């Protein structure tokens, strides 16, 4: 494959083990420290990349307050081998933040505004709760349905509109845990998880090289016993079919194809197209459909050209309608989230976009795929998608 000099290539990807937010492995680790550790280790294993060449550290983070405030990208960068002469910015597109970080870096490379970037994101939902410091404008209800800010209710709405049953959602939830457990046992996450020290349930310091969020014992029967989490009267969305509240970080090294060639680096993949799209906030989970359609059109590809998909599992009731309308539901077991998803691994907001992108690249590498799509819904009615080609 011949690449143009300003094509954007992914050099490497790594992530932390995913930790439970309540009493989990990262309970005594700050978000900046988690981010800095990840960046440092990823640079250490890429010896051909000079940290001094990093133009910018672009880091996704949603709740930018407390330890995640005051530009956590810069805070984390200062604690790594990246020199002070490199810059840092923190971005938020809610759930799509670290994929937006990737897009921002890609756009800079494409326009000649830098050659080497470190991108990713973090969310420590155990230290900085989802609603900490949030003060929604009550006037918003004049412009969008009042429940649009309640993600679980938007999932209920989307599931109802598309005829998604409780049983279908439970089966999807079981699948996520089973596939994530299988990937763990078979070492499929080995290339992407960068071990971190943390504390086990007994308070002992240990090195974690696995996700503590996966529940292999999950069954259809155990999920069927759960009560609705958001709509007690007739609701179908439960805690077991929703993304977990977890702590984690993800990181990528991206650069221009020309710089990768000059350094003698074999990239993992090249970005073929990117897109964002908006939808009615009341069905925010539908965002991946128009975003993916737009990205595919820009890449000159059709849905059948895509070998593998990573779709962020915000809710089973949201993921299934997306797969249905993208016309890949019948190919789910061959193409979609083959290592499980956020129902098993969790959804640390600022982390997830780069996490699903990196997991996709590993799935493509392990299974020989050529084209892949990473996509996710975004609170208040957006979608974001990236089309990758393996090189």
Swiss-Prot record:
GO terms for cellular component: cytoplasm. Heterotetramer of two alpha chains (FadB) and two beta chains (FadA). It comes from Pseudomonas fluorescens (strain Pf0-1). It is an enzyme of class 2 (transferase). Keywords: Acyltransferase, Cytoplasm, Fatty acid metabolism, Lipid degradation, Lipid metabolism, Transferase. InterPro entries: FadA (IPR012805), Thiolase (IPR002155), Thiolase-like (IPR016039), Thiolase-like_sf_Thiolase (IPR050215), Thiolase_acyl_enz_int_AS (IPR020615), Thiolase_AS (IPR020610), Thiolase_C (IPR020617), Thiolase_CS (IPR020613). HAMAP family: FadA. Its EC number is 2.3.1.16. One of its GO terms (molecular function) is acetyl-CoA C-acyltransferase activity. Catalyzes the final step of fatty acid oxidation in which acetyl-CoA is released and the CoA ester of a fatty acid two carbons shorter is formed. Pathway: Lipid metabolism; fatty acid beta-oxidation. Belongs to the thiolase-like superfamily. Thiolase family. One of its GO terms (biological process) is phenylacetate catabolic process. SUPFAM superfamilies: Thiolase-like (SSF53901). Its main location: cytoplasm. This is 3-ketoacyl-CoA thiolase. It comes from the Bacteria. It catalyses: an acyl-CoA + acetyl-CoA = a 3-oxoacyl-CoA + CoA. The active site is at residues 95, 347, 377. It is found in: Cytoplasm.
């Amino acid at each position: 494959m011949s690449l143009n000099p300003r094509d954007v290539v992914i050099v490497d990807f790594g992530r932390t083990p995913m930790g439970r937010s309540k009493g989990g492995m990262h309970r005594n680790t700050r978000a900046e420290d988690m981010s800095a550790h990840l960046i440092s280790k990823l640079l250490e294993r890429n010896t051909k990349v000079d940290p001094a060449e990093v133009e910018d550290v672009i880091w996704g983070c949603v709740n930018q307050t407390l330890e995640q405030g005051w530009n956590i990208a810069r805070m984390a960068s200062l604690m790594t081998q990246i020199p002070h002469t490199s810059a840092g910015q923190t971005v938020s597109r809610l759930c799509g933040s670290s994929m937006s970080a990737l897009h921002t870096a890609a756009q800079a490379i494409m326009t000649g505004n830098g050659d080497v970037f470190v991108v990713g994101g973090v969310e420590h939902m155990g230290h900085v709760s989802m609603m900490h410091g949030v003060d929604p404008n009550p006037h918003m209800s004049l412009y969008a349905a009042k429940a649009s800010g309640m993600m679980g209710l938007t999932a209920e709405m989307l599931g109802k509109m598309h005829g998604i049953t409780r049983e279908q959602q439970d089966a999807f939830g079981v699948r996520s845990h089973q596939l994530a457990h299988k990937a763990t046992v078979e070492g499929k996450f080995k290339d992407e998880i960068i071990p971190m020290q943390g504390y086990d349930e007994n308070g002992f310091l240990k090195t974690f090289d696995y996700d503590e969020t996966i529940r292999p014992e999950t069954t259809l029967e155990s999920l069927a016993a759960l009560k609705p989490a958001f709509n007690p009267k007739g609701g179908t969305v439960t805690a077991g079919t929703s993304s977990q509240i977890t702590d984690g970080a993800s990181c990528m090294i991206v650069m221009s194809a020309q710089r990768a060639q000059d350094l003698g680096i074999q990239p993992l993949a090249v970005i073929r197209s990117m897109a964002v799209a908006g939808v009615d906030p009341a069905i925010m989970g539908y965002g991946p459909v128009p975003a993916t359609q737009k990205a595919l059109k820009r890449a000159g590809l059709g849905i059948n050209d895509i070998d593998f998909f990573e779709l962020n599992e915000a809710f089973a009731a949201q993921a299934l309608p997306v797969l249905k309308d993208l016309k890949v539901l019948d190919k789910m077991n061959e193409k979609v989230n083959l290592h499980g998803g956020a129902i098993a691994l969790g959804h640390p907001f600022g982390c997830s976009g780069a996490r699903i992108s990196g997991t996709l690249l590993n799935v493509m590498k392990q299974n020989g795929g050529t084209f892949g799509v990473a996509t996710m819904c975004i609170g208040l009615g957006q979608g974001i998608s990236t089309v990758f080609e393996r090189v």
